[in-house]
Design a protein with these regions (language model features):
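HEAT/HEAT-like alpha-solenoid repeats
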Residues: 7-17, 50-57, 93-103, 135-142, ...
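A signal for specific C-terminal beta-sheet/loop modules enriched in small/flexible residues
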Residues: 31, 144-145
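WD40 beta-propeller repeat blades
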Residues: 45, 100, 110, 120, ...
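Short intrinsically disordered, low-complexity segments
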Residues: 85-86, 95, 123, 137
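Helix N-cap and loop-to-helix transition residues
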Residues: 18, 36, 60, 104, ...
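Short, hydrophobic/charged alpha-helical patches characteristic of ARM/HEAT alpha-solenoid repeats
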Residues: 1-4, 16-21, 38-46, 62-63, ...
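Alpha-helical solenoid repeat architecture
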Residues: 8-13, 23-37, 51-54, 65-79, ...
């Protein structure tokens, strides 16, 4: 499915307007970035990442949230090669205004997750640190309550089911990172995920 639809989506991604189309394509890219490492790297090489980074300059809340989630998925699922390309294309800098948003806590946290994951790559850690975005992670996490955040996720149509088992497994290594930012945001997401499952009456979080 991803292989068949890749060309179509990338052609649509070249159409940067109108915002309604951008919102839809960004949402599709958000999910395609976590299809597989190969798909993620092909998307990066063929312009999918460029489109997402371009849309980061927009002001539409739904579009920006898709962008933050897409960048987080790219960092989580694309491997070190994709992470290096993200940093070369200044993804950490583009994440700064998203992580600094005063109006959307979900947007801020998704952006902070993306930059924290990038910082776990030792090859690009210093470059990510210089962007200034990483410094926003700990204060944000300290200001949020996982239970309340879980309810926000459940109320949001695109995150109402929480993260799948594969996503959660990819968050676990953050807990062992030498970066405190990665540790705290990884722990926060896993706590929020447990709260989501509790709200849904499920007993298994999916990490094991």
């Amino acid at each position: 499915m991803a292989r068949i639809g890749l060309g179509v989506i990338l052609n649509l991604a070249k159409e940067r307007e109108p915002v309604e189309l951008a919102r839809s394509v960004a949402g599709i890219l958000e999910h395609m970035f976590k299809h597989s490492e190969e798909t993620c790297q092909r998307l990066v090489a063929a312009g999918g990442l460029d489109a997402v980074l371009y849309w980061c300059r927009r002001t539409d809340p739904a579009l920006l949230r898709h962008c933050a989630l897409a960048l987080g998925n790219c960092a989580l699922h694309g491997g070190q090669a994709a992470q290096r390309r993200m940093v070369e294309k200044r993804a950490a800098e583009w994440l700064f205004p998203l992580a600094f948003s005063k109006e959307d806590e979900l947007l801020r946290l998704h952006a902070c997750l993306a930059v924290a994951v990038l910082a776990t790559n030792k090859e690009v850690e210093r470059e990510v640190e210089r962007s200034g975005t990483l410094a926003l992670v700990e204060p944000l996490v300290a200001s949020l309550d996982p239970g309340r955040f879980a309810r926000c996720l459940v109320d949001a149509s695109d995150t109402s089911q929480g993260r799948g088992p594969d996503d959660l497994q990819r968050l676990v290594p953050l807990l062992d990172s030498s970066r405190l930012e990665a540790q705290c945001i990884g722990a926060f997401y896993l706590c929020a995920e447990a709260a989501i499952k509790s709200l849904q009456g499920k007993t298994k979080v999916g990490v094991g």
